């Protein structure tokens, strides 16, 4: 017969405690919002650092390094930083000295933390795949705060190896350096989730109601990827087309009213079509006088939406004969946008909290 041994809970040392580390049984959950990335400034050096990291990612550029690196270092990184820096300067948040993407992603994190106030063991943070704050630094911070589980949320509604997959790659790469790695979950693509489609439709209707004209055509413009990536099995194009189909259905519009295009192509390789710039130009030349463009694939406004669409696409349309142009903002940290993020996070935290 064994006798019970009384243990003073106040005197008991938590299992796994090491100086400078949280107890093994801390049981906290980290929610990590991950966006693409941003340079730290618009000058040549920060732009060079950012573009080097971004364009060195084999998920983004699927060329042999022996072929790509001479092009990257010999041509791209000697010319593109200056041009890209000028583009960023036009949209730069001067008050906070940062890009809008960083401003909005931080705001999303802060608002999500507030919305999850009923879950005291959940910590919300945010990071970038490229640039700062880095995925590695924030993951390490969450672990140091006692998070033994991390829910990663790559902020891309439509999956692509060039975005969602590389965000997950980077997180696991960071965890490889940790002795004590947390359990990991990743929020799946949400391109067809009703809460996302409803948020998009609501945002579009709300912004169209503020215009003094009615667009004849509304374009859903998604960031493109090289066509060979899609041909090899990347589901991104199918996800984009399904988002537009569901959005069209929700808004009650036909295929001529709401169309799909792809933007931001880079290099001479064929990318997903139809191209946004070519479509906008053709609409203007064909006599269409009023259009609006929305970017469902971007969780927050950034260089590709504010400058490439808000400025370049508008100029292209006007030069081609168009009259009225509107760029509908991304969901950002709006009420609609935060509803989507909170809904996805709460669902994926099931069983953990």
UniProtKB/Swiss-Prot annotation:
CDD domains: Ferrochelatase_C, Ferrochelatase_N. It is an enzyme of class 4 (lyase). Keywords: Cytoplasm, Heme biosynthesis, Iron, Lyase, Metal-binding, Porphyrin biosynthesis. SUPFAM superfamilies: Chelatase (SSF53800). It catalyses: heme b + 2 H(+) = protoporphyrin IX + Fe(2+). Belongs to the ferrochelatase family. Catalyzes the ferrous insertion into protoporphyrin IX. This is Ferrochelatase. The lineage of its organism: Bacteria, Pseudomonadati, Pseudomonadota, Alphaproteobacteria, Hyphomicrobiales.
């Amino acid at each position: 017969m064994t006798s019970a041994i009384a243990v003073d809970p106040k005197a008991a040392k938590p299992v796994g405690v090491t100086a400078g580390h949280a107890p093994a049984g801390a049981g906290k959950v980290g929610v990590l919002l991950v966006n693409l990335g941003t340079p730290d400034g618009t000058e040549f050096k920060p732009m060079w650092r950012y573009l080097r990291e971004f364009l060195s990612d084999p998920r983004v550029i699927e060329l042999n390094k022996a072929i790509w690196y001479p092009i990257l270092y010999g041509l791209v990184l000697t010319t593109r930083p200056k041009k890209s820096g000028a583009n960023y300067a036009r949209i730069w948040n001067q008050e906070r000295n940062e890009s809008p993407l960083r401003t909005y992603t931080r705001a999303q994190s802060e608002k999500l933390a507030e919305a999850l106030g009923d879950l005291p063991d959940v910590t919300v943070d945010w990071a970038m795949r490229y640039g700062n704050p880095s995925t590695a630094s924030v993951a390490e911070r969450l672990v140091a705060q006692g998070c033994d589980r991390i829910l990663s949320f790559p902020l891309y509604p439509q999956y692509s190896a060039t975005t969602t997959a590389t965000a997950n790659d980077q997180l696991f790469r960071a965890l490889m350096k940790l002795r004590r790695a947390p359990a990991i979950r990743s929020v799946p693509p949400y391109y067809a989730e009703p809460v996302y489609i409803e948020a998009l439709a609501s945002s579009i209707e709300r912004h169209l109601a503020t215009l003094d004209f009615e667009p004849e055509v509304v374009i859903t413009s998604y960031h493109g990827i090289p066509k060979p990536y899609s041909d090899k099995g990347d589901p991104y194009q199918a996800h984009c087309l399904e988002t537009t189909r569901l959005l069209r259905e929700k808004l009650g519009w036909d295929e001529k009213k709401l169309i799909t295009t792809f933007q931001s192509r880079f290099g001479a390789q064929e990318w997903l079509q139809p191209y946004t710039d070519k479509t906008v130009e053709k609409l203007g030349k064909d006599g269409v006088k009023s259009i609006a463009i929305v970017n469902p694939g971007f969780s927050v406004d950034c260089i590709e939406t504010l400058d490439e669409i808000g400025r370049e696409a508008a100029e292209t349309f006007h030069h081609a004969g168009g009259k009225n142009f509107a760029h509908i903002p991304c969901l950002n940290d709006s009420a609609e946008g935060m509803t989507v993020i909170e809904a996805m996070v709460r669902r994926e935290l099931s069983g953990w909290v």
